[in-house]
Amino acid sequence: MWNSDWKKGEDYPAWGDTDVYKKTISGGYLVNGESPKDAYWRVAKTVAKRLYKPELAEKFFEYIWKGWLCLASPVLSNTGTDRGLPISCFGIDVADSIQDIGNKNLEMMLLAKHGGGVGIGINQIRAAGKRITGNGTSDGVVPFCKIYDSTILATNQGSVRRGAASVNINIEHDDFLDWVEIREPKGDVNRQSLNLHQCAVVGDKFMRRLEAGDQDARQRWAKLLQKRKATGEPYILFKGNTNKSNPEAYKKNSLKVHMTNICSEIVLHTDESHSFVCCLSSLNLDKYDEWKNTNLIYDATWFLDGVLEEFIQRAKNMKGFENSVRSAEKGRALGLGVLGWHSLLQKNGIAFEGLLAQFKTREIFSKIKIETERASRALAEVYGEPLWCSGTGFRNTHLRAVAPTVSNSKLSGNVSPGIEPWAANVFTEQSAKGTFIRKNNELKKVFRKVGIDTKEVWDKVLADGGSVQGIKQLDGWNYDNRGRLTQEDDGEAVKNVFKTFKEINQLELVRQAGIRQDYIDQSVSLNLAFPAEAPPRWLNQVHIEAWKRGIKTLYYTRTESVLRGDIAAAAMDPDCLSCDG
């Protein structure tokens, strides 16, 4: 609970002086009456100690205190405590045997018991009608999904987040068309898995069949897009794009990616004895101009390697974590990401659509790539190369991934989540952490400048679903090439800069994501948004373009029903606190 005696700038950062920050951070992130400042010190000291460099604690704290480095939910809530682990996102792969199906169910149960959200690969399980050992035939993947569904529902994870799991299957699996219906509350209840999320794994071979007009491929693809438009999922993992761009360490060890995690930004190897972990936190792009000439990215990579070591040392003797620890020790994969991308663009008067945003994408993500790799080489010199990195000069197989950051964006100054556009410029949000009225900070500055920061105008924006396109007082206002408001004719129109998710051309979103993917060795939680009346041909075009641009994963498809300003953020998946980097 928030302590009213805490002082701004002393017990919590000045930029956190908002109801959103206070309600969110006091909703499960603090322990034993500690203040936010105490929590930041707890994390910084613990991680520095794991690196055997206690002198780094002050530097880590300063990055967090300034709002430059934003901690993933489990990192903030659990690091340095005995109530949970600093990593709570995992991926497990199930082999085609009753023994492994049962073993992985137990593994998932034990991971979930300790706060884990779990991605499950079920593609190896034989399809319905296939012969099994002895007499009889298989019932396919659907009954086993029901087992996992019941397990995750029954496993309590405490107060920070509830149980969650996703199941991954290849679109060419013989059971795909049955599997894609398991979230529908109709038919045989024993074949329903209403609590599982879904991810379709799509290979290049299938996409080439689709382009060639193969009828079976077209039927499966159409069903996938139909479900994504109606329900938001299944997520998509483009397996070919992913494995073609695997890092040197994976190629040397013949490691492949078969699945993704519950938030679709992790693309790491899994097999019968290796389960991946998601070690995440984010750089705050809203404050990019403050930190771009500092050592933040380099030091944040050291920080995450320390977080991973904290996980390994605490989990190595815990039942159910053997496969996760084994994978973490051999690869030490990290996922340094970003949040506040749309906030940064708006702060600088840059429209999401267009060349300037593309240039900024290359500038920032190339810098992150260079600096994280420099840090990993330095880490390898100090601590050595793990098994899978042997001979590469790196400490980590992977370094970069962009998580959803829905909660983290509230704890970072009420900025935009991840690389995603704002769903609305104002909305009422109901979540597990409280109920808030959230207004776009940059738009509020514009309204003040123009002289329209009134309840009536904000009510109009809210009534219009969070859009400013109907605010006539903004007509004629532009940004010049230095990001300053002006009424001169030249420049970017304010209304373009403050377009919402659904108002932005989704092909431009995909093009920008394709540029970004070139610099990210894991993946990005990339949502798409379409109006309810969007024709199937348009969805098809955007999804195929994503594959062609080399994008590795697609997260949710948002339609009109989940993009209205009054429920925009409530529609964001609460399950992804596990990797809210």
Regions found by a protein language model. Give the residues of each.
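Internal maturation/activation junctions in enzymes
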Residues: 105, 299-325, 329, 348-405, ...
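Catalytic alpha/beta core of large soluble enzyme barrels
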Residues: 14, 257-271, 312-314, 400-568, ...
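Core structural elements
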Residues: 15-17, 63-79, 171, 303-314, ...
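Gly/Pro-rich turn-and-neighbor structural signature
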Residues: 36-42, 46-97, 210-212, 216-226, ...
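Active-site cavity-forming subdomains of large catalytic enzyme subunits
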Residues: 2-11, 16, 87-290, 321-325, ...
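Conserved catalytic alpha/beta cores of large enzymes that bind or transform nucleotide phosphates
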Residues: 138-146, 153-227, 231-234, 302, ...
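Secondary-structure capping and boundary motifs in well-ordered enzyme cores
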Residues: 17, 35-36, 82-83, 94-97, ...
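Acidic/polar, glycine-rich intrinsically disordered N-terminal extensions of enzymes
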Residues: 1-86, 222, 548, 556-561, ...
